[in-house]
Amino acid sequence: MAHLLEKTRKITSILKRSEEQLQDELPYNAITRQLADIIHCNACIINSKGRLLGYFMRYKTNTDRVEQFFQTKIFPDDYVQGANMIYETEANLPVEHDMSIFPIESRDDFPDGLTTIAPIHVSGIRLGSLIIWRNDKKFEDEDLVLVEIASTVVGIQLLNFQREEDEKNIRRRTAVTMAVNTLSYSELRAVSAILGELNGNEGKLTASVIADRIGITRSVIVNALRKLESAGIIESRSLGMKGTYLKVLISDIFEEVKKRDY
């Protein structure tokens, strides 16, 4: 019992992770590593759309084809759909099972491989799946208790993270709307023309050329850029005679300007 309690405390310590620790490209790598070390298995977390949020492999079990899923950070649609249909923890699925994470071509190499899938949901919202697997050792009741706890803890963390992201998105959109509202009619035309010159979210432009093309003064473009830059929406850098380098920091500006029909 004391051993189980110690492992449980290690898992619940995940909740103490700060927001900054969840900003990485794979924010749950550290969590899956911790879980894999505690339960002695391979582990990964995917969201409900199949995006890989984190993984850690203690043991070699997959082929190059499957490891490509981890490199591209997205799981196949059919596997994700199957995982989303699992509403309670499915334990010790054999390699022959459709939801086994062991690929068909490696099942002869790992005939005793076992997969366990635990749904991650909070307040009725399906957020993803926690998947763990071993080459040849059954997941016992103690392991499954820890998996249930881990899926709940990760679910709470995911929900909190999503709420924080939603709040950030709202703040970003509000900042864009307020900045655009400060622009004059001519400045809005200038911003629309500038955004059209970019290659994606960044590019090089020459203010005088744009000004001549749309029939405004260069100072209008300069003022518009200053307003957007002071609002943190863009950043710019003079290239001297070559023009100005511009990078969009908040991409909502494209949609906001388009809505104004400029």
Swiss-Prot record:
The ranges the UniProt entry gives for DNA binding are 207-226
Output this protein's name.
Answer: Global transcriptional regulator CodY
What is a single cellular component term in the Gene Ontology annotation?
cytoplasm
Under Gene Ontology molecular function, one entry of this record is: GTP binding
> Which GO BP terms, alphabetically?
negative regulation of DNA-templated transcription
Where it sits in the cell: the answer is: Cytoplasm
Annotated Pfam families: CodY, HTH_CodY
Q: Which NCBIfam families match?
A: codY_Gpos, PRK04158.1
Its source organism is: Streptococcus pneumoniae serotype 4 (strain ATCC BAA-334 / TIGR4)
Q: Does the keyword tRNA processing apply?
A: no
Which stretches of sequence are listed as region GAF domain?
Answer: 1-159
